[in-house]
């Protein structure tokens, strides 16, 4: 009876060692599961005040109390020249801004060159404008001559048209006169006409 009341122990599987990452055993799994149950399945009674934090396996996050690591100061390279700071007062800066820049002094040769350049520009502009004016006058005269010739041609065409109308009217009148039977024959000379035979006397 005692032997039957006892539970049979489960047979342990033979453990094999494999090179690489180690796996958890049954005892480790049971221990971790009991710890998680203690963590997450703790007393569920109502708690007041500040809530308790939960512990989670993993890397802990940084808090505000932990000081941030300050970057280490890097030494400046020795090849750079030393920095020189020049400070100017407000009065000096204002005075330099208000002072006008001195005009460069012009020599006599530069003045002569400027005068000759101005005269040359004036002469070139006058010559070009004179050429354009003469060409404009010539074109205007030619246009007026062409207009006069066109007017003369139109007048001659009108005169020819009137003469043609007069000739047509005269030809129509001559046709009327030639075709009329009521007028005497003007072609014969009087006295030379043949005598008409009188009819038989009764």
From Swiss-Prot:
Assembly mode: Interacts with BLOC1S4, BLOC1S5 and BLOC1S6. Component of the biogenesis of lysosome-related organelles complex 1 (BLOC-1) composed of BLOC1S1, BLOC1S2, BLOC1S3, BLOC1S4, BLOC1S5, BLOC1S6, DTNBP1/BLOC1S7 and SNAPIN/BLOC1S8. Octamer composed of one copy each BLOC1S1, BLOC1S2, BLOC1S3, BLOC1S4, BLOC1S5, BLOC1S6, DTNBP1/BLOC1S7 and SNAPIN/BLOC1S8. The BLOC-1 complex associates with the AP-3 protein complex and membrane protein cargos. Interacts directly with BLOC1S2.
Gene that this sequence comes from: BLOC1S3
Protein name: Biogenesis of lysosome-related organelles complex 1 subunit 3
Biased composition (Acidic residues): 61-71
Pathology linked to this chain's protein: Hermansky-Pudlak syndrome 8: A form of Hermansky-Pudlak syndrome, a genetically heterogeneous autosomal recessive disorder characterized by oculocutaneous albinism, bleeding due to platelet storage pool deficiency, and lysosomal storage defects. This syndrome results from defects of diverse cytoplasmic organelles including melanosomes, platelet dense granules and lysosomes. Ceroid storage in the lungs is associated with pulmonary fibrosis, a common cause of premature death in individuals with HPS.
Organism in which the protein naturally occurs: Homo sapiens
Keywords: Albinism, Cytoplasm, Hermansky-Pudlak syndrome, Phosphoprotein
Single GO BP term: melanosome organization
Function of the protein: Component of the BLOC-1 complex, a complex that is required for normal biogenesis of lysosome-related organelles (LRO), such as platelet dense granules and melanosomes. In concert with the AP-3 complex, the BLOC-1 complex is required to target membrane protein cargos into vesicles assembled at cell bodies for delivery into neurites and nerve terminals. The BLOC-1 complex, in association with SNARE proteins, is also proposed to be involved in neurite extension. Plays a role in intracellular vesicle trafficking.
